[in-house]
């Protein structure tokens, strides 16, 4: 039986930097506490949640063996709730959100959670793979799938982007994120995570635990400071100042049928207008958000003029600038509170984080439509248009 899936709540952790405040937390605990926060905000019993679909990129070590399920059990939630963890690379939790919404729409479940977690400090990207993803290629394969850095450089060359262009976006991201935190724009979408203190902090009388309530990746920088950063390769333009960060974090979104939301006295806050998972040219695979944007706009019968806010993941500055150049867009409504360059990119959690941020900002601005898109490893890209209700 068909039903209309709606978002009733969405919350994320602050994003921790590499080796930062969240680095001592097991990913199961990080996501598990996010589940508990989500349930606490809705006020419903955990028994109401029928299925969970989570996203993680590096399925190894502490993130192996279905972390979405492990996290649920780790914090003592009912074992009857089923969970699946998917791998769609950086698009994992965005695609997980599509999957949960689709299960609700199909009448398979009435209440579900989509989520994502990545503890990159503890489980480095690519862990468990000796040669890298899918390598060595069989001789008969003709695959030109560059690493992420080279992919970013390729689209920069294709679009004629300069070092100044990408540094400028890096600065904009930092400045917007700083303003967003100063104005408490992220306060509703985040919760304070309890973390163990260091020996030095305990010696200073801080106790055994402290609360982390802000994203850690923000930096006070300038164009001059960014220009001094060296790229990995002499001829390249991407540096640590105009690329996403290695991060730790989790995010969770609760979905329900409109009928069940009413029965549980939960406010429907948004719905999906259109969704897409697309394959893109492996040679230029970080241009995938361009293909995903065309796909969701086409499915929705909309144009970018109809979109109030855009969240496009800042994996590298060239991803956003290439997208903007192709669609002839300025950045006025793109990543209005900064992006992954400033906030961080806990890869498996970022898709859900982008949806969460877009929803809260639509509500804050009293706007209606947001487009969320991101590139993903393996020459994939995800796209979602949500409508605030």
Named regions from a protein language model:
Residues 12-13, 24, 32-33, 41, ...:
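N-terminal extracellular/periplasmic Venus flytrap/periplasmic-binding protein-like
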């Amino acid at each position: 039986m068909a039903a209309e899936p709606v978002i009733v709540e969405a919350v994320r952790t602050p994003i921790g930097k590499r080796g930062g405040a969240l680095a001592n937390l097991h990913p199961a605990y990080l996501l598990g506490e996010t589940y508990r926060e989500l349930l606490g905000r809705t006020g419903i019993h955990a028994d109401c949640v029928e299925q969970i679909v989570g996203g993680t990129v590096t399925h190894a070590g502490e993130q192996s063996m279905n972390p979405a399920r492990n996290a649920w059990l780790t914090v003592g939630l009912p074992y009857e709730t089923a969970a699946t963890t998917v791998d769609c690379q950086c698009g994992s939790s965005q695609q997980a959100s599509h999957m949960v919404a689709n299960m609700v729409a199909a009448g398979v479940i009435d209440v579900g959670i989509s989520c994502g977690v990545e503890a990159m400090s503890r489980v480095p990207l690519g862990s468990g793979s000796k040669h890298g993803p899918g390598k060595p290629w069989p001789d008969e394969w003709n695959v030109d799938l560059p690493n992420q850095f080279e992919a970013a450089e390729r689209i920069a060359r294709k679009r004629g982007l300069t070092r100044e262009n990408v540094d400028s976006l890096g600065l904009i991201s930092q400045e917007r994120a700083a303003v967003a935190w100063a104005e408490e724009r992220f306060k509703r979408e985040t919760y304070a995570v309890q973390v163990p203190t260091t020996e030095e902090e305990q010696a200073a009388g801080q106790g055994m635990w402290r609360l982390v309530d802000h994203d850690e990746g923000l930096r006070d920088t300038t164009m001059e400071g960014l220009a001094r950063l060296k790229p990995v390769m002499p001829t390249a333009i991407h540096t640590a100042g105009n690329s996403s960060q290695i991060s730790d974090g989790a995010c969770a979104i609760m979905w329900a049928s409109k009928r069940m939301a009413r029965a549980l006295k939960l406010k429907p806050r948004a719905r999906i207008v259109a969704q897409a998972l697309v394959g893109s040219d492996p040679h230029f695979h970080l241009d995938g958000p361009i293909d995903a944007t065309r796909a969701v706009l086409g499915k929705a019968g909309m144009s970018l003029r109809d979109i109030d806010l855009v969240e496009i993941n800042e994996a590298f500055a060239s991803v956003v600038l290439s997208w903007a150049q192709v669609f002839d867009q300025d950045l006025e409504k793109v990543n209005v509170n900064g992006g992954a360059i400033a906030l961080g990119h806990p890869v498996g959690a970022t898709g859900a984080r982008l949806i969460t941020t877009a929803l809260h900002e639509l509500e804050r601005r009293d706007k209606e439509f947001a487009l969320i898109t991101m590139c993903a490893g393996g020459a994939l890209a995800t796209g979602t248009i949500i409508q605030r209700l």
